[in-house]
Amino acid sequence: MESRVVFESDLNLKATELRLGLPGTEEKEDNNLRTHAVLRNNKRQVRETSQDSVSISKASHHQQHVETVSAPPPKAKIVGWPPIRSYRKNSVQEGEGDGIFVKVSMDGAPYLRKVDLKVYGGYPELLKALETMFKLAIGEYSEREGYKGSEYAPTYEDKDGDWMLVGDVPWDMFVTSCKRLRIMKGSEARGLGCVV
């Protein structure tokens, strides 16, 4: 039995003890300091013995005389976290000043384009831009005849998912309801609006 006591004293358990604290510092068991820390952090403490309850009541009485400690200030946001790519950061900062971009596809063309509807003031400007973009002639729109004299007819998909001819509704309504544009062959666009 004595050899066991000697063995425990040789191990230097204090040096190899795992605890929550900085290395090289001594932690003193002081009930008053512990209760002050608990009161300052607004956390409850588990009562272990009746002596602890007496010291806690003394500490709370002492706390009334000490100036009240305010809650710590909120943590500052870390700059650069979460990581955002620069193009997304710029687009978030610009906000609603951005344009209304819609995809434009053309039957027979192997590529898509995007156009900003806010750039154009009306249908004639948009149609002129589409003609130069896809190198085709769309022609003039009339409510009776649609796009007469053209092999293609510009159509758009509205919010409801319906395909309509470009020019059927007023420009402002078109800008707010257009989801995407498609330049169809005239034969496919016959049932959408007027006879082409």
From Swiss-Prot:
SUPFAM superfamilies: CAD & PB1 domains. GO terms for biological process: auxin-activated signaling pathway; regulation of DNA-templated transcription. It holds the Pfam family AUX_IAA. The keyword Nucleus applies. Keywords: Auxin signaling pathway, Nucleus, Repressor, Transcription, Transcription regulation. The keyword Transcription regulation applies. Induction: By auxin and cycloheximide. GO terms for cellular component: nucleus. Signal peptide: none annotated. A motif (EAR-like (transcriptional repression)) lies at residues 18-22. Residues 44-74 are annotated as: Disordered. It is found in: Nucleus. Residues 99-186 form the PB1 domain. Homodimers and heterodimers. Aux/IAA proteins are short-lived transcriptional factors that function as repressors of early auxin response genes at low auxin concentrations. Repression is thought to result from the interaction with auxin response factors (ARFs), proteins that bind to the auxin-responsive promoter element (AuxRE). Formation of heterodimers with ARF proteins may alter their ability to modulate early auxin response genes expression. The N-terminal half of the protein contains two conserved domains I and II. Domain I includes a slightly degenerated ERF-associated amphiphilic repression (EAR) motif which seems to be involved in the activity of transcriptional repression. Domain II is required for the correct degradation of the protein through the SCF-mediated ubiquitin-proteasome pathway. Interactions between Aux/IAA proteins and auxin response factors (ARFs) occur through their C-terminal dimerization domains III and IV. Belongs to the Aux/IAA family. This is Auxin-induced protein 22B.
